[in-house]
Amino acid sequence: MVFEGHLVGTGLKVGVVVGRFNEFITSKLLGGALDGLKRHGVEENDIDVAWVPGAFEIPLIAKKMANSGKYDAVITLGTVIRGATTHYDYVCNEVAKGVASLSLQTDIPVIFGVLTTETIEQAIERAGTKAGNKGYESAVAAIEMAHLSKHWA
């Protein structure tokens, strides 16, 4: 038997956690995510958005959302751009590990929509220009995973 999540978001409740750092990019990711959710049938009043200071703070609030019992899926959005120090490596690794572990801890799909790029140009491309919008893609993944997860609930 083959299982696939369908892409109709009607009736789903979705939490979104967005890092404010690099807000000119993360706001575009959020716009893409909201567009993706609404285009697939998620009602605006079934979407909650929490802004956090930066990417490093995303896992805690995503965990609290997932544990609240209110959401069928949680989307995480942020942007980390490499600088001149090793700070980038620490932030990227910890955020990725933190978000990745949440689905397993909470049994709620937690989608990783955090950009980790070498340059600001790469981030801009992934926030709605040449490379699509990773926020939109994260929204579609959240809908699909929410339905797949419910199959075994």
Curated annotation (Swiss-Prot):
Activity is competitively inhibited by the bisubstrate-type compounds TS23, JC33 and JC72, with Ki values in the low nanomolar range. Coiled coil: none annotated. The keyword ATP-binding does not apply. It catalyses: (2S)-2-hydroxy-3-oxobutyl phosphate + 5-amino-6-(D-ribitylamino)uracil = 6,7-dimethyl-8-(1-D-ribityl)lumazine + phosphate + 2 H2O + H(+). It holds the Pfam family DMRL_synthase. Transmembrane segments: none annotated. The active site is at 87 (proton donor). Keywords: Riboflavin biosynthesis, Transferase. It is an enzyme of class 2 (transferase). (2S)-2-hydroxy-3-oxobutyl phosphate binds at residues 84-85, 126. InterPro entries: LS, LS/RS, LS/RS_sf. GO terms for molecular function: 6,7-dimethyl-8-ribityllumazine synthase activity. Catalyzes the formation of 6,7-dimethyl-8-ribityllumazine by condensation of 5-amino-6-(D-ribitylamino)uracil with 3,4-dihydroxy-2-butanone 4-phosphate. This is the penultimate step in the biosynthesis of riboflavin. Belongs to the DMRL synthase family. Forms an icosahedral capsid composed of 60 subunits, arranged as a dodecamer of pentamers. This is 6,7-dimethyl-8-ribityllumazine synthase. It comes from Bacillus anthracis. The lineage of its organism: Bacteria, Bacillati, Bacillota, Bacilli, Bacillales.
